[in-house]
């Protein structure tokens, strides 16, 4: 319930590194608001529109920056490198202009400064939000989590998601499953990890390394009485799948981008492959590796059915 007010906290805890994560959490909290309440509509629209726009711009900049960084190892020709620099500069300029237009930064003489104006606008929108009771919120979240799990399972079993496409298939699937962990984290103590490893169907994921990972922790809120649980092993398993698919996808998109760029500058595919070395991963391999990971978790291990059953049990 009051977790939505932590949007204000998130807005004041932006990090130079991994700054998309707070924006994902802001979007998650906005998506959880009741759209049937008229007073929520303005806040939802403002928060989603702005946070999604900035997050997309940062994503494009991150990709351009990763290519530029990678080229320190790949050492493509000056012609290719110059194009990489142009792409990086364009992404940086687009992000900067976006933040200027939104009032998040101001441009002075030879300096970029933080500006409160854009954040004050978002915070003003929060004043209009109507919150459910803590008990009602728990039920709504459990139902949402269960529905997400069942929908994802159905999408794969009935092939509603085309996994032969990297961006519109594999990456879209990853986006969908990632919301579960983002919701759980953004709710700041409303969702906690279960503590029954002996009966956890994902108990093989309950390892010291997973338990110690900063990405696998959820806040504890002693004041929250109507909590719900996420299977501990299931949360770790989901995180592992998200991470694996992200690595596979990034490698594939990097190869695809540099293949297009390199060949446009007269390089042969073999020369590009040689430059990339172990970072080379063609489309077929990307699709194969990602599909194997997805099918194993969804079809063989029935991962989302198990997660859905756990949430369903708490609705009883």
Give, region by region, the residue ranges found by the protein language model.
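Function-determining surface determinants
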Residues: 1-316
